Design a protein with these regions (language model features):
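Active-site catalytic pocket residues across diverse enzymes, especially alpha/beta-hydrolases
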Residues: 2, 29, 70
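C-terminal helical subdomain
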Residues: 11, 19, 35-70, 74, ...
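Short, small/polar-rich loop/turn modules that mediate ligand/substrate recognition or access, typified
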Residues: 3, 8, 74-76
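Short, flexible catalytic-loop segment of classical short-chain dehydrogenase/reductase
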Residues: 14-24, 28
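Short C-terminal tail/terminal secondary-structure segment
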Residues: 64, 75-100
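Short-chain dehydrogenase/reductase
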Residues: 24-35, 100
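A short alpha-helix capping/helix-coil boundary motif
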Residues: 4-6, 22, 40-42
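Catalytic loop of short-chain dehydrogenase/reductase
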Residues: 1-5, 16-17, 46, 85-87
Length: 100
């Protein structure tokens, strides 16, 4: 209904992002495994194709793209910015590593 008025609706779905919020998410892994923050991020990203978390600037760039004229034809879609995590079955990987 709003498309002809130039209003678009999209979603951005990031994976792990190295931020203070992401750091807090790593605390249980750090405690459980006795590892550093950097090692915790490496542990959670070891099975995604890029093997690293995103930066806040990278996620901001995705937001800027979706808000810009360069994406004027993009609507009704989801931009997944997860380093390729969607391309692998992370549920299966976690199941194999941790068990039921």
């Amino acid at each position: 209904d709003y498309g002809p008025s130039g209003i678009r609706a999209n979603a951005l779905c990031p994976g792990w992002v190295e931020t203070p919020m992401g750091d807090r998410s790593m605390e249980s892994l750090m405690t459980k495994h006795g590892i550093s923050l950097g090692d915790a991020y490496r542990l959670v990203t070891q099975h995604i194709p890029l093997r690293r978390p995103a930066t806040a600037d990278e996620i901001a760039a995705c937001c800027l793209f979706l808000a810009s004229d360069e994406s004027s034809i993009v609507t009704g879609t989801t931009l997944v910015a997860d380093g390729g995590g969607l391309a692998v079955d992370l549920t299966e990987v976690a199941w194999q590593q941790e068990g039921p």
